[in-house]
Design a protein with these regions (language model features):
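Conserved active-site tyrosine of GNAT-family acetyltransferases
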Residues: 29-34, 92, 122, 160, ...
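N-terminal beta-strand motif that seeds the catalytic metal site of vicinal oxygen chelate
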Residues: 2-27, 72-77, 130-158, 171, ...
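Short alpha-helix boundary/capping motifs
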Residues: 23, 82, 154-155, 213, ...
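Vicinal oxygen chelate
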Residues: 2-8, 90-143, 182-183, 226-270
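Core segments of cupin and vicinal oxygen chelate
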Residues: 11-59, 106, 113, 152-191, ...
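A cross-kingdom feature marking solvent-exposed beta-strand/loop segments within repeated
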Residues: 17, 27, 44-49, 58-65, ...
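Conserved short beta-strand elements that form part of the metal-binding/catalytic scaffold
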Residues: 40-73, 123-131, 174-204, 209-213, ...
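Double-stranded beta-helix
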Residues: 158, 163-167, 177, 199, ...
Length: 270
């Protein structure tokens, strides 16, 4: 793969759309996310995979595909329009990035138009747009509303950070202990992606946004009553200032309920 170019990327990612995970215990995981974590299984989707929506307007925020080894299948980022998809594809192709396919209707639930590429650690990235949003499902006011952010581990997190900044147009929002941990954003939310130095490439954790601290405490109660005790929290982070509580899912993925993540205005020095 050609390394990150130094010129400023014209790609304008607007949000973290979702995450698809490889699951080694998909039946247990489906029951967990639907009955305990507060997501809604999209029953209309056929096949061995499972897809879940939150109460927000995104078609689905989490997908599970069966595999004999757990890990990230796809990180999904949003672009503003089909035209943005086409221009982003053209820019990445011209810069020599490894593209896995060309822009097209994606074979996933919803009406998404996009394409895929790989980051420097080989993780598949989706850049997509959609004109269709679902009606807000307000049945449970304490359920997750959307994905907040995810954190990945990387043996060369500096290079991976530079890839997302220079190739995909994310912005550096914060860092922790020098180059140990970088926080990247694409909008005013403090971060949508964290990149942590590690001895391997993997998912560190994925965070689900709930309405407020009260909603987070209620989700903790649901989990605790079902015998799932927090592995960390509840508490409040320094970088981002968000409240948090972490649990372990059936596959061993670390999952976070979070809220109150600070917003950063463009051009703000802090």
């Amino acid at each position: 793969m050609v390394g990150p170019h130094k010129r400023k990327s014209m790609i304008n990612i607007t949000d973290l759309r979702g995450l698809v995970l490889k699951s080694t215990k998909i039946e247990e995981a489906v029951e967990f996310y639907e009955n305990l974590w507060g997501l809604k299984n999209i029953d209309s989707w056929q096949g061995d995979s499972a897809f879940f929506e939150a109460t927000g307007d995104e078609g689905f925020i989490l997908g599970l595909v069966p595999d004999n080894q757990r890990g990230i299948e796809t990180i999904r980022f949003a672009l503003g329009s089909p035209e943005d998809v086409d221009t982003s594809f053209a820019e990445l192709k011209a810069s020599g990035q490894k593209l896995l396919d060309e822009p097209d209707r994606l074979p996933i639930p919803g009406e998404y138009y996009g394409f895929h590429l790989q980051d420097l650690d080989g993780t598949k990235i989706e850049l997509s747009a959609t004109s269709k949003t679902k009606k807000n499902n307000g049945e449970d006011p304490f359920a997750p509303q959307r994905l907040s952010h995810l954190v990945v581990n990387s043996p060369d997190n500096v290079a991976l950070k530079d890839f997302y900044l220079n190739c995909l147009g994310l912005k550096l929002a914060d860092w922790y202990k020098g180059d140990l941990f970088f926080f990247l954003r694409c909008n005013q939310q403090h971060h949508v992606l964290g990149v942590e130095r590690s001895d391997n490439s993997s998912l560190n954790h994925v965070a689900f946004h709930v309405e407020d601290l009260d909603a987070m405490m209620r989700r903790i109660g649901v989990m605790s009553n079902a015998g799932h005790k927090p592995i960390w929290g509840p508490g409040r982070h320094g970088p981002g200032n968000n409240c948090f509580c972490y649990f372990e899912g059936p596959d061993g993925f670390v999952l976070e309920f979070t809220s109150e993540l600070i917003e950063v205005a463009d051009g703000e020095e802090w």
